[in-house]
């Protein structure tokens, strides 16, 4: 298994059951990519479906977004395959290349723009990945480069580590407001850390509607009050 990833297995046989967690980058390198024509056709169909729902703007939060992905979006926009305005988050490791190229950073074109630098923090494999030291170092470097950081954090340990890293940027005088994505699990201490950090919390009430029963079934009853604490954040 790649670091930070998990291949779920049958409890009796130990054989992989087909569920792969946090393995997007690995799979992207193994699955043949569609041609630009195939991609444009699929994107055009999806774009029209979104238009029919009144959706006029999108944000791609894929953590592996790179210069080449940006160029793909430029081509899709140029060919009118994609009519929505697009904000493209970029992978933290790609920020130096974006800065050197100047791509999207100084543009006032709202049809396609560079957004936050995405950092994945997970506990899918049983331990925090990356570790706390690496999280702090990455957030510090991205903040120094002038990028807003969007930290994917679901488990309480991930939320806590992300909040601590963001809080540090405030003590250093940063004027940027960084993001915590999801914040699915927040016991009282973690909630206090998030509030104190000043982070923008980007959570998904729709997940509760779509998967709330599963969350309750798969989470210990004692932890139910700490799931998706949108009301607690508002207070």
Please report, for each region that a protein language model flagged, where it lies by residue:
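Structural detector of well-ordered beta-strand residues that form the stable sheet scaffold
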Residues: 87, 150, 179-181, 202
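Active-site beta-loop-alpha junctions enriched in small/polar residues
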Residues: 63, 89-93, 117-122, 152-156, ...
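Divalent metal-coordination and catalytic microenvironments
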Residues: 54, 114, 152, 180, ...
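Distinct, well-ordered alpha-helical segments
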Residues: 70-75, 96-103, 159-171, 193
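Aromatic- and carboxylate-enriched substrate-binding clefts and catalytic-loop regions
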Residues: 176-188
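Active-site-adjacent C-terminal substructures of enzyme catalytic domains
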Residues: 185-235
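Short acidic/histidine-rich active-site segments
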Residues: 61, 147-157, 203-205, 233-235
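Catalytic pocket of metal/acid-base enzymes, prominently hydrolases
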Residues: 1-89, 102-146
């Amino acid at each position: 298994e790649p670091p930070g990833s998990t291949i779920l297995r049958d409890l009796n046989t130990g054989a992989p059951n087909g569920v792969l967690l946090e393995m997007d980058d690995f799979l992207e390198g193994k699955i043949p990519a569609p041609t630009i024509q195939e991609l444009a056709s699929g994107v055009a169909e999806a774009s029209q479906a979104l238009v029919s729902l009144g959706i006029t703007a999108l944000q791609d939060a894929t953590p592996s977004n790179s210069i080449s992905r940006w160029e793909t979006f430029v081509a899709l926009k140029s060919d009118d395959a994609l009519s929505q305005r697009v904000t493209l988050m970029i992978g933290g490791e790609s920020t130096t290349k974006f800065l050197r190229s100047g791509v999207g950073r100084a543009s006032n074109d709202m049809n396609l723009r560079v957004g936050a630098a995405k950092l994945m923090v997970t506990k899918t494999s049983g331990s925090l990945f990356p570790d706390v030291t690496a999280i702090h170092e990455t957030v510090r470097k991205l903040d120094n480069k002038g990028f807003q950081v969007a930290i994917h954090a679901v488990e309480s340990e991930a939320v806590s580590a992300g909040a601590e890293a963001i809080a540090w940027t405030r003590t250093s005088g940063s004027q940027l407001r960084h993001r915590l994505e999801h914040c699915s699990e927040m016991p009282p201490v973690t909630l206090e850390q998030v509030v104190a950090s000043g982070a923008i919390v980007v959570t998904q009430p729709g997940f509760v509607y779509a998967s709330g029963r599963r969350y309750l079934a798969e989470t210990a009853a004692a932890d139910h009050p700490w799931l998706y604490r949108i009301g607690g954040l508002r207070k």
